Amino acid sequence: MITRLKNWPRLLKTPLQIARHSIQQFSHLAGHYERPPQSGKSSRDPYLVTVVQGRSKKPRFPGERANQRFGEDSWFVRSTPLAEVMGVADGVGGWRDVGVDAGRFAKELMTCCSGQTQRSGFDGRSPRNLLIASFQELTHREHPVVGSSTACLATMHRKDCTLYTANLGDSGFLVVRNGRVLHRSVEQTHDFNTPYQLTVPPEDRKECYYCDKPEMAVSTRHSLLPGDLVLLATDGLFDNMPESMLLKILNGLKERGERDLLQCASQVVEKARELSLNATFQSPFAIKARQHNVSYSGGGKPDDITLILASVEVQSA
């Protein structure tokens, strides 16, 4: 009998994978984000109008939005003199089974990323280096937070109006221009529903967990134009909403002010939430399950959803 998939290992290796490792050892909805003023910007430089929306799979605790979390997802948005920076992370849910808050690691990783953008010399041209430095900061703490998460970072360097990205796992991003997808990130997975992930494992069981390196994040670079849309999201969006449906909502944007972007982002999140609870909808997740010969009756995948939506703008003359 085929039943809906409730839990799939996103976290632990199989016994065979553990053996191979041993052999290879030696080898609720958010309000919009208001960008704080920064010195050093030229009034003619491109900038991003950015909003954040999200929805927890189920209520976690009061005030989680203010804590930059939606369930086990986390996010950050920062503006520096040279760049606009944003990121999302999805805490791997398998940690719940061993009594660990699966979202805490994601939150701490995003906090480190946000803090690293304020360091001297940060110019936004290498989000992968930002991810590497942030993960090192996290792991070098006296008492590191145990857990793992995916990560997707994007920066827009203002002077050259260029988007730089680093993506590890199955969160991701889209660049949309004139109603069409200019670029979409590619998932990195070990197996079905088992993404690449940054991990701080328990000391006594390191060999049992996937421990991918931030250097494995895929980096891309894209020249942007005024009017382009940049979207970052966790897999709660991409697993439930087909690209065509997402584009239909995004293409309904007539204006690019914060209020308009916020309404658009709300529509996307609410539609993804609706589809995640639809047991008959042939979601992207259901299609992937079938491609991997995984028993799954179809329908959406209930999950936390986090979305950052940004529009490239320039000051009018």
Curated annotation (Swiss-Prot):
Coiled coil: none annotated. Residues 46-312 form the PPM-type phosphatase domain. SMART domains: PP2C_SIG (SM00331), PP2Cc (SM00332). One of its GO terms (cellular component) is mitochondrion. Keywords: Hydrolase, Magnesium, Manganese, Metal-binding, Protein phosphatase. Mn(2+) 1 binds at residues 90-91. This is Protein phosphatase PTC7 homolog fig. It comes from Drosophila erecta (Fruit fly). The lineage of its organism: Eukaryota, Metazoa, Ecdysozoa, Arthropoda, Hexapoda.
